[in-house]
């Protein structure tokens, strides 16, 4: 989706930058926040990975995928279009498909026929440019047999990144559990519960959960993941507002129509190869900055307080100004002037909320990173 909250919805195969490198041979999973075209790294929040067989709560290694949940893949089975991605996870023979709305990542997983032991891994420890201690805390609640909510707070390049989420499955959960290997001592009375086996609230800074589903009907599993930087209620509202009652195919069609409209703002007369180069480049100009605001107008500011956008205003984040001031923003002034105005207003709000009273230098997810110069 152009300028959506994810930045770029894709598989995670590489541990730096945007999380994907063409030379990689394995996919770790599918997370919900990414950069596009950066040299530095962060994000990769809320990783989902389907698998069959015995549940594995370790990532595994690229040269020994049997030790974890990651899978080999082949570029011959990949398909990437604006608004859609698919690939076969070779270790499991699972077809993975992705699409999105402005604030919701949408998955569809087709498991092999007659699968009996299908699982979804939800890894809240994973991150791009990951290291021990990056996840400060994570929480996961099973609201009902179809719905999860939760959050995680990380300290990476973004000094304090709040990611709230709501997950909706198309099939009921049969069984679930988790593993939390944190070493922080906890002396409260929650320790009397066994969080690892069907306990509906899981908490920790090294939390990986699994969910079992019945695939005897041979139907694919669809998963919708709403995101918010404000709270879980905001993530649920975003999920409902943008995807309620819609199938994967319907959302994919809407998303691709939106991309078609966006990319049609410039028309060129050229051969096929030149058109591919041109429109791929134009596509990349429409990924960042990213929407950073709930459907009800609330957003987390640079001061980490919750603000309410004025009517007609959309708050954006991911301003790599030293990259974009000379190319991206002049182009947006020409082809998308109303959106460019929203970018400027977001920058001005950044200034007003900044204790240093500065415009964005390199900001993302409600944080100023002080990387490079932009003015």
Segments from the language model and where they lie:
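Accessory carbohydrate-recognition regions in carbohydrate-active enzymes
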Residues: 1-329, 333-375
């Amino acid at each position: 989706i152009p300028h959506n909250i994810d930045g770029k919805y894709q598989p995670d195969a590489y541990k730096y930058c945007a999380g994907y490198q063409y030379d990689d041979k394995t996919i770790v999973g599918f997370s919900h926040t990414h950069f596009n075209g950066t040299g530095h790294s962060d994000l990769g929040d809320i990783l989902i990975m389907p698998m069959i067989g015995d549940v594995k709560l370790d990532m595994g290694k690229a040269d020994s995928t049997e030790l974890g949940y990651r899978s080999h893949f082949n570029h011959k089975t990949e398909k990437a279009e604006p608004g859609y991605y698919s690939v076969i996870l070779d270790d499991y023979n699972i077809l993975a498909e992705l699409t999105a709305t402005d604030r919701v990542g949408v998955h569809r997983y087709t498991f092999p026929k007659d699968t009996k032991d299908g699982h979804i891994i939800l890894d809240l420890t994973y991150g791009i440019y990951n290291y021990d201690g990056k996840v400060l805390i994570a929480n996961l609640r099973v609201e009902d047999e179809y719905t999860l909510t939760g959050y995680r707070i990380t300290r990476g390049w973004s000094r304090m990144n709040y990611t709230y989420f709501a997950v909706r499955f198309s099939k009921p959960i049969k069984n679930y559990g988790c593993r939390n290997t944190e070493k922080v001592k906890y002396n409260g009375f929650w320790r009397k519960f066994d969080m690892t086996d069907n306990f509906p609230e899981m908490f920790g800074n090294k939390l990986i959960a699994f969910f079992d589903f019945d695939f005897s009907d041979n139907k694919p599993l669809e998963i919708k993941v709403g995101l918010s930087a404000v709270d879980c209620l905001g993530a649920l509202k975003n999920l409902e507002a943008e995807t309620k009652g819609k199938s994967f195919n319907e959302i994919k069609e809407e998303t691709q129509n939106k991309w078609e409209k966006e990319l049609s703002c410039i028309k060129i007369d050229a051969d096929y190869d030149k058109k591919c180069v041109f429109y791929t480049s134009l596509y990349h100009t429409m990924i960042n900055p990213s929407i950073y605001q709930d459907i009800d107008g609330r957003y987390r500011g640079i001061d980490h307080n919750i603000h309410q956008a004025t009517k007609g205003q959309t708050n954006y984040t991911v301003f790599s100004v030293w990259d974009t001031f000379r190319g991206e923003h002049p182009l947006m002034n020409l082809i998308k002037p109303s959106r460019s105005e929203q970018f400027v207003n977001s920058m001005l709000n950044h200034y007003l909320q900044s204790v240093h009273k500065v415009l964005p230098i390199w900001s993302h997810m409600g944080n100023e990173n002080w990387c490079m110069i932009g003015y």
